Amino acid sequence: LLTPGFVDSHVHVLGGGGEGGFANRTPEATMEGLTKFGVTTVVGCLGTDGIGRDMCALVAKTKGLNEQGMSAYCYTGSYQIPVRTLTDSIVKDIMMIQEIIGTGEIAISDHRSSQPTFEEFARVVADTRLGGVLSGKAGIVNVHLGDSPRCLDLIERVVDETEIPASQILPTHINRNEMLFGKSIEYALKGGAVDFTGNEDIDYWETICDEVRVCNGIKRMLDAGVNPDRMTISSDGQGSLPMYSSDGEFLGMGVGQSSCLLKEVKECVFKTEIPLEIAISTITSNPADILHLKGKGKVE
């Protein structure tokens, strides 16, 4: 069976973590660690820590992966607003830095976010779109969704109250909990793209952490009438994953891995009987099309 190389659209290529202190920082992604799991295209991002890791280092890491043969891109910014850019301008970063295709991962509905106002968030999306228009890139804002009951409120307001289309925003971690997932179905039915976060230990995150299992979530979206082209799966690779027992006891710190992509696709096919062509598109053609990655995600 021949498939395109996988597109992992959300990877902390510089490493993630740090939320428990400096000793909790996770290692960088490596060429071998990506390709051995079938990933040939990667989009790097910064997360909670936009200080100890910055845009100079992220762009340099992205360039290095490209020199090794990976098709590597990145977002400008991190969780925070105002966005910490390379050139002091979102528009300029996207226009003038070849590897930068959008902004992210901007955090909302999360205690670790900057608690941005609607106006602040809308301006980030608008500037990102303009940068994309002027450079021929996607101009996507990759949005981290947390546990707050506000869910996708800011995203929905941008789509409803401005002229900016839903195609400029890609919310991720939509399977974090049942409430957020339900809201994400509604958003996707309006045409928005959504990104599931895959897991290496699928049973743990479903049973202990109450996440929506990716294969079940995709099946539910398909049954609800969501366009299959609007769904993607990413790994949150190299991100820190605190592990707890059912009693809440801390068991240790895991690290996100791109290996979860193929595991999740297999579950879609064998557990929920989703057609292979739909399942595999979530890590190939769908992210490539949504992010305007030309020549990626398909075998032609």
State each model region's role.
Residues H10, G38, L65, H144, ...:
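Divalent metal-coordination and catalytic microenvironments
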Residues D127-P242, F250-L251:
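Active-site core of metal-dependent hydrolases
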Residues L34, L65, S184-Y187, M221, ...:
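Generic structural signal for hydrophobic
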Residues D223-E300:
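His/Asp/Glu-enriched, well-ordered alpha-helical/loop segment
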Residues L46-S184:
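Histidine/acidic-residue-rich, glycine-tolerant segments that coordinate divalent metal ions
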Residues L2-A60:
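Metal-associated gating/positioning segment near the N- to mid-region
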Residues L1, M31, S89-I94, C215-N227:
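Short amphipathic alpha-helices and their capping/turn segments at secondary-structure boundaries
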